[in-house]
């Protein structure tokens, strides 16, 4: 048997050209060419650190192609994360997935790319060295980390502000990060009645102070298979037979399909750098009141609409005990579903896209209407199966069940 060995040699750049000359990505900072070359693999932001040559854009655009993007996606195991990882992997990007929980938490993401394309990496968001390790080989960083409620270990400020600030500072020190995207929330403001939205606003300011050319995405309430609005509503209705309308159901907002938000993030990476340093407000095409969105939910799960109008003071009183006890008991409390005090505070004001804000259209995208496919996942709550339900006129046949 003849053994053939091959030595992989990194070829120097010709004429001092940047390794990203064929890519639409542009560096956030003026990094000299020698930092992007083979002299210093720490800043090469490519697979050259493993001796397999520089990443180059090639292929037809599928997941077996190479897009030139090596993205570290913080918060990839969450709701939006799975859709973003899927779209990045689909276009041939390598995706590094930091996670801090069980090793099973990112397992479903590995199926979204070719072998070795989606790489889970254990990390600690409070450990700077851990953050540097998961960011070391990336040229794109996307931060999706956020939390709608407090826990014993992470306050609103920890999850939504301090971690985002630390990630931005590490990315700045890295020197080879070409695009940085911070995912915030529509309605983020220092004057918001919601602590989470105030923390998100502080995070935006901290990120832009560290990386002035970072892109800020402000999605509205996201709708999708794993969402945290229509699913809890449906489960509450199936369990108790009615839905509480907090504040009478008159609050206006613009829910958006989660796949559209992921597409907007990818579109910002694909552009010529025109999205750098800008803030986008990503709301759906239609404005709903809480009551109108609940009607869509009832229609989809085929149940008779039954409501109990709950004034804000009563709703806050019902939600307050968890917030009071969260740091006073020696065990974790259940996650709040409908009665989340901070979300109730947020519902006291309308959350709509500003008239002069950059929107989906500025990224050449048209968001889906929240009818049909985007809410089709709710058929799982229909009584008797997907073809039945309480509002269906024909009765379920007696021989339907075995």
UniProtKB/Swiss-Prot annotation:
Where does it mainly reside?
Answer: mitochondrion
User: Which cofactors must be present for this protein to function?
Assistant: FAD
List the Pfam families hit by this protein, alphabetically.
Epimerase
The residue span given for the transit peptide is: 1-43
- Which controlled-vocabulary keywords does the entry list? Electron transport, FAD, Flavoprotein, Mitochondrion, Respiratory chain, Transit peptide, Transport
Keyword flag Aminoacyl-tRNA synthetase: no
Reply yes or no: does the keyword Lyase apply. no
Q: Subcellular localization, per the record?
A: Mitochondrion matrix
The cofactor note reads: Binds 1 FAD per subunit.
**By its UniProt entry, which InterPro entries does this protein fall under?**
ComplexI_NDUFA9_subunit, Epimerase_deHydtase, NAD(P)-bd_dom_sf
- CC terms in the record's Gene Ontology section: mitochondrial matrix; mitochondrion
**Similarity annotation:** Belongs to the complex I NDUFA9 subunit family.
Described by its record, this protein's role is as follows:
Accessory subunit of the mitochondrial membrane respiratory chain NADH dehydrogenase (Complex I), that is believed not to be involved in catalysis. Complex I functions in the transfer of electrons from NADH to the respiratory chain. The immediate electron acceptor for the enzyme is believed to be ubiquinone.
Assembly and interactions? Complex I is composed of at least 49 different subunits. This a component of the hydrophobic protein fraction.
Record PANTHER family: NADH DEHYDROGENASE [UBIQUINONE] 1 ALPHA SUBCOMPLEX SUBUNIT 9, MITOCHONDRIAL, NADH-UBIQUINONE OXIDOREDUCTASE 39 KDA SUBUNIT-RELATED
Question: What's the name of the protein?
Answer: NADH dehydrogenase [ubiquinone] 1 alpha subcomplex subunit 9, mitochondrial
Native organism is Arabidopsis thaliana (Mouse-ear cress)
């Amino acid at each position: 048997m003849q053994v053939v060995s091959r030595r992989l040699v990194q070829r120097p750049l010709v004429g001092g050209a940047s390794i990203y000359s064929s890519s639409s990505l542009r560096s956030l900072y003026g990094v000299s060419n020698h930092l992007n070359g083979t002299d210093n693999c720490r800043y090469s932001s490519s697979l050259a650190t493993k001796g397999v040559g520089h990443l180059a854009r090639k292929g037809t655009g599928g997941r077996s192609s190479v897009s030139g993007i090596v993205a570290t996606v913080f918060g990839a195991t969450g709701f939006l994360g799975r859709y973003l990882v899927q779209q990045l992997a689909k276009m041939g990007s390598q995706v590094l997935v930091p996670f801090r929980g069980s090793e099973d938490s990112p397992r479903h993401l590995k199926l979204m790319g070719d072998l070795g394309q989606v790489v889970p990496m254990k990390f600690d968001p409070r450990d700077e060295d851990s953050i540097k390790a998961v960011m070391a080989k990336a040229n794109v960083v996307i931060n999706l980390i956020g939390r709608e409620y407090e826990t014993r270990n992470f306050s609103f400020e920890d999850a939504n502000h301090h971690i985002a600030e630390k990630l931005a500072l590490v990315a700045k020190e890295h020197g080879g990060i070409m695009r940085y995207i911070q995912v915030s929330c529509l309605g983020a403001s220092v004057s918001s009645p919601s602590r989470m939205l105030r923390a998100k606003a502080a995070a935006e300011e901290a990120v832009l102070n560290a990386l002035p050319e970072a892109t800020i995405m402000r999605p509205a309430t996201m709708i999708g298979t794993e969402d945290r609005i229509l699913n809890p509503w449906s489960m509450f209705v199936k369990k108790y037979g009615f839905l509480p309308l907090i504040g009478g159901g008159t609050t206006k907002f613009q829910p958006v399909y989660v796949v559209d938000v992921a597409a907007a993030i990818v579109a910002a990476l694909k552009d010529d750098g025109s999205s750098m340093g800008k803030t986008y407000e990503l709301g759906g095409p239609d404005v709903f009141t809480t009551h109108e969105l609940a009607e869509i939910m009832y229609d989809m799960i085929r149940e008779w609409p039954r409501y109990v109008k709950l004034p804000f003071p009563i709703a806050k009183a019902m939600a307050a005990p968890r917030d009071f006890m969260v740091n006073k008991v020696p065990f974790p409390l259940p996650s709040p579903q409908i009665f989340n005090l901070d979300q109730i505070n947020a519902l006291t004001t309308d959350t709509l896209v500003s008239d002069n804000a950059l929107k989906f259209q500025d990224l050449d995208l048209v968001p889906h209407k929240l009818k049909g496919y985007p809410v089709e996942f709710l058929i799982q709550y229909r009584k008797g199966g997907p073809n039945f339900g309480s509002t269906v006129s024909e009765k379920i046949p007696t021989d339907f069940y075995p």
